[in-house]
Amino acid sequence: MTLPFRNDLLSSLLARCKTVPLSRFSQPLFWLLLLLLAHQCAGLTWRLLDLGSQQASQPWQPAMVASQGQGSARLDLSGISRLSLFGKAKQQAQAADAVAADAPKTQLNAQLNGVLASSDPAKSIAIIAHNGVQNSYGIGDFIDGTQAKIRQVFADRVIIERDGRDETLMLDGEEYGKPLPKPGNQDDKLSSVRSELLGNPGKITDYLNISPVRVDGRMVGYRLNPGSNPELFNQLGLVANDMAVSINGLDLRDNAQAMQAMQQVAGATEMTVTVERQGQLYDVYVGLSE
């Protein structure tokens, strides 16, 4: 298919057009139609030429044929499998690195006010104050405003990771250098305390002294102090002369809400006590395992 084909076609059309009688009014229209026809023929010719050249440039490829003894052609899908179209499965987390039992005492300006050490690390909680703000932290949490991460919680200390090394943050009042306690002992202790108190509520005074505080005849809270056995009081993150103002968000200064709070506490295994300490409010988490 070549250019002479287009010229012969146009010459034939012109020869035929000369034999057609044209009036004065139809002649301009005739030439307009003739030009449009010629333009269309030229465009068609060039498209055919381009198509032929593209087909000639494509390399020939043999058709895939199934080999004898097989029902269908075998395809190599290894390349597709390496694309990770649906993402990559996360590898199972490696066992946690052993915590340094002799980790040096931290220089971090933070105070460990309470711990809830559990045999299940996910349930362990550390109550830490830093820059005047006290919060509860679990394993893997970063202490607010620092790069220190909680590594493990024990009954009298917390191991934190700071600048790539383990450090020890002792419970306030405890002496650094004591043997590392076994995690999980506090679970059994809290469980036994709960059972004891349910059987004999009067035993609460062995662990906690509670006294109502009134100002001008108005209830403002309940003063909390350790009992004859102060260990549990300290481990819960309470401080002498803390004043409890709410339990689980129920205001203890309101008689109706205080009664509701007491009903909840009777069968609760955990609670959040809000205390007022030196003019600031702190939330103290208390867990009593069954």
UniProtKB/Swiss-Prot annotation:
GO terms for cellular component: plasma membrane; type II protein secretion system complex. One of its GO terms (biological process) is protein secretion by the type II secretion system. The keyword Transmembrane helix applies. The chain crosses the membrane at residues 29-46. Residues 47-290 are periplasmic. Belongs to the GSP C family. This is Type II secretion system protein C. It comes from Aeromonas hydrophila. The lineage of its organism: Bacteria, Pseudomonadati, Pseudomonadota, Gammaproteobacteria, Aeromonadales. The gene is exeC.
